Amino acid sequence: MSVATLIAITLGCIAWSLWIRRVTWSCRWEVAATLNIALQGVAVFLMSPWASETIGHVLYQLTGKWNVEDYIGHDAYIVAASAIVYNSLGRLQDDNAMQRSFKQYVERPATICIPVLLATFWMGNGAAVYRADFFQVPTDFWLSAYWILLCGTLLYLLGYDARAMLVLRRDPQSRKIANIYLFASVSGMLACATRIVTSLVPALQPIENGRLVWVFACACGAIFALASAHSWRIKTRWLTSSRH
């Protein structure tokens, strides 16, 4: 299966999920999950070769730097991962405890990461070498630092979410959806781990060529989207039946 097909399927799953969950934007306890899906869609779209060949050229004319759309997409991934952690913590803690935990362990590291990412992106091959697929840009010191920082942050956030899902799955009523979310988080973590390894071992880059990262990243986005849509349909079905 080509990368373009993977991206198209993932964006289709995300679009369908957002349609199913369209009323959740005004629902306090569901909006974080919906925001996660939307931002993953933005990230996948901006990282796609099509975006690089169109939006990327426009941004180059404005900034003089290549691959700016990919950097924006990666920022969207960080916020998406933060949103899904927020959603998970909301299921496990009361509001005050959740807000404290989120600010200390999620919001603060993510906020620090984004400007540091911009600096490492701007100073290395990330902004100097054009490729339609950013995963195929050869790494130098700064781009390797960029990938390690980005993927390390995402590993931390997704690992935090996975830990919350391990707690949530102890509840028999939540076990099925927790297992699916856990699988999605692991897929995202595998994408990050693959990218870190290829950054540290440049000889592997032409062999992997970004394909494994795309497979795991798209699996993460599609599974989160489908699981969130399914979860919302179950809730609305229960609410509808309880009224009769």
Question: Predicted segments — roles?
Answer:
Residues 1-70, 174:
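Membrane-proximal first intracellular loop
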Residues 59-63, 127-140, 167-176, 201-208:
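Juxtamembrane/interface segments of multi-pass membrane proteins
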Residues 17-18, 69-107:
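Internal transmembrane alpha-helix with an interfacial aromatic "cap," most often the third helix
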Residues 45-57, 119-132, 196-204:
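Membrane-helix interface motif
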Residues 1-10, 66-79, 139-155, 208-222:
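Alpha-helical transmembrane segments of polytopic membrane proteins
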Residues 13, 152-244:
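C-terminal transmembrane-bundle signature of multipass membrane proteins
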Residues 25-38, 101-107, 173-184, 209-216:
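Membrane-interfacial loop-to-transmembrane alpha-helix junctions, especially the N-terminal start
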Residues 89-158:
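Membrane-proximal helix-loop-helix units in multi-pass membrane proteins
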